Amino acid sequence: MRQGLMAAVLFATFALTGCGTDSAGKSADQQLQVTATTSQIADAAENIGGKHVKVTSLMGPGVDPHLYKASQGDTKKLMSADVVLYSGLHLEGKMEDVLQKIGEQKQSAAVAEAIPKNKLIPAGEGKTFDPHVWFSIPLWIYAVDEIEAQFSKAMPQHADAFRKNAKEYKEDLQYLDKWSRKEIAHIPEKSRVLVTAHDAFAYFGNEYGFKVKGLQGLSTDSDYGLRDVQELVDLLTEKQIKAVFVESSVSEKSINAVVEGAKEKGHTVTIGGQLYSDAMGEKGTKEGTYEGMFRHNINTITKALK
């Protein structure tokens, strides 16, 4: 409620002051101003838009999108953009009021919601879906296509360039997908169990043949208890799994509890490394790109489990 009230006040202020841009009125040499919520979306937008777009990402390294709340500065960035790109599927759960109001006033798109519903993983008993779609490269390509469509709509004079850039980016992603499958083939099938702090890797598991278990649910906003820890400990002991993984955007406390629980049962489990789940690495590093993040995760998982 508080977040929604703040958004309403800010939007009213921007409406009175005329803040905002008109992408349709841009000249050929002007850049499209794009604001993306997550770094995964921002990376795709930069690759597709090339020199014709300027992309601002709200969430940086180590930021949890499930818990993220838009600041006044974020709202200004959203309102001053020509195009707003966000994931949707309730990933940005604390920002839904803000994003809904943005959509009433300017061009915006929930890029993950471009994926056909029959390809999504249902979440619980409701009508919601697992939002962590970027861990399936074939599914993430639907989001890439949606970004290209939004850019072409905003700047039709550069549609050919956006189409060409998107084609090249998708070819890179398809190569990354093939490489990932080749690397994972080195892990024995019985060892393909991926245990992490929260349930962010279900699409990854479906795509690459892993049994995936997270201590918390789909959102880090959900809690976990002693029973959840014990169930994971029992699984690790039964399957003789030797490694679990921490996440860059989630506290290590929960996974450390699992490691200690296994130790008490006489089974040694190590921390296999840190995976990038809801956020990518620092901008300017390999892990700060979608490809670099994905390669890091594959290399870390393969090294720990093979």
From Swiss-Prot:
GO terms for molecular function: metal ion binding. Mn(2+) binds at residues 66, 132, 198, 278. A lipid is attached at residue 19 (N-palmitoyl cysteine). Residues 1-18 form the signal peptide. Keywords: Cell membrane, Lipoprotein, Manganese, Membrane, Metal-binding, Palmitate, Signal, Transport. Pfam families: ZnuA. It is found in: Cell membrane; Membrane raft. GO terms for biological process: cell adhesion; metal ion transport. Disruption phenotype: Null mutant is very sensitive to manganese. Its main location: membrane. InterPro entries: AdhesinB, Bact_metal-bind_prot9, Lipoprotein_PsaA-like, ZnuA-like. It is a lipid-anchor. Disulfide bonds: none annotated. A lipid is attached at residue 19 (S-diacylglycerol cysteine). Probably part of ATP-binding cassette (ABC) transport system MntABCD involved in manganese import. Binds manganese and delivers it to the membrane permease for translocation into the cytoplasm. Belongs to the bacterial solute-binding protein 9 family. The complex is probably composed of two ATP-binding proteins (MntB), two transmembrane proteins (MntC and MntD) and a solute-binding protein (MntA). Interacts with FloT. This is Manganese-binding lipoprotein MntA. The lineage of its organism: Bacteria, Bacillati, Bacillota, Bacilli, Bacillales. The gene is mntA.
